[in-house]
């Protein structure tokens, strides 16, 4: 099988990239793909860039060019609710927090003609959960919401929390990746490490913890690939 792995920033994928054997680099437009073997599994690692449009275009290219059996979205996220920095978030579903077509009878966050939420593949998510549980960091399993904003405003944070009370984390790509996978019939999973608390500490806190959070999520993804290779 071949697995696609998507991260938005170099610091989120760097430890994965340097672990790929026989790595072949391909550039398509502004996107960079790294193809090879990681812990016995064929992978295509993709640097998507930040934000929903870039993530969607990148995911489409990944699927069309490489036809992966599974797509993993990894990296970092802003924590919501009872999460803390360096906790792990594993999504059971992802939604857009910056979409509103409720005037036409849709739920808040639901794109027109799309489901209210994009559900992570249950089988692969359970396998990833079993791997993540081996680590000492707190694991949260639940809803993740996406939008094209870095949430540093407490007011905006409260709006998101009120609208999506089940959300465990907020970030800027997962819903777009998941929607693209839904449209093209490719299973997806999402695992990220919390780099900051949304609405608290803003960019300074983020820059302090993002590197280690990115390494943590990458470590779990590598262990997940190894577990697949062993079966």
Regions found by a protein language model. Name each.
Residues 1-65:
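N-terminal short beta-loop-beta anion/metal-coordinating cradle
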Residues 29, 50, 93-96, 194-196:
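Short, acidic/turn-prone active-site loops that include or flank metal/cofactor-
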Residues 67-72:
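Proline-aspartate-enriched helix->loop->beta-strand connector
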Residues 80-164:
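Mid-sequence, gly/pro-rich, charge-dense loop/helix-turn segments that line enzyme active sites
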Residues 151-199:
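A C-terminal functional module that forms or caps the active site or interfaces directly
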Residues 199-231:
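His/Asp/Glu-rich mid-to-C-terminal helical/loop segments that flank catalytic regions of hydrolases
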